[in-house]
Amino acid sequence: AGWQMADEYLSGDVRAKLRMAQFAAETNPEFVVNVDALTKAQPRELEASEIDVRLGATWLAPEILQKFMTETFQIPYYLRHAVKVRYSPYTAEWRVEGKTATGRGDIISSETYGTSRANAYKILEETLNLKDVRIYDTIEDTEGKPKRVLNKRETMLAQQKQQVIKDAFANWVWQDPQRRIALVKQYNELFNSTRPREYD
């Protein structure tokens, strides 16, 4: 690959470079010096308290969000196969399948985390797609054609529940020690691997 200046080699994605150097050092001891230098050049690991994990972050696995939804909205066991969180990398959109599976009698999704017009699953889906929930009514215009108008009161109520869901996620995400370790590691790998070049 040729020679590189130390300041260039010890900058950029130093985590990936360290993995490559460690692999090379397994068969060629000359690379041990690279491993040592790159180990010292690694960025400081961020801790959970320094990481802001938000609903809708595309780096979160759907399984994490599924677990949050299942635990927080207390989905009955017999319905867990029907209510799923999915992410499409093609459209960059989150979908909650089975939004109406629990029915209107579900107090948690229709009152605690939702409203009579937007249940918790609909609000979660909007939140995952980084949208503010909006509730519309259909009325007839002067020509008798249907027209959608924003229902300000219902929208305000739904947006309050949206904030309740965001707060619940912020409290939930770091509670489990294994989940915390996995998410911190994943975040550091994805977003804390780069070191700026320092010119000598």
Which stretches of residues belong to each language-model region?
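Charged, low-complexity intrinsically disordered regions
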Residues: 1-186, 191
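ASCE P-loop NTPase motor core, strongest for the SF2 helicase catalytic module
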Residues: 189-200
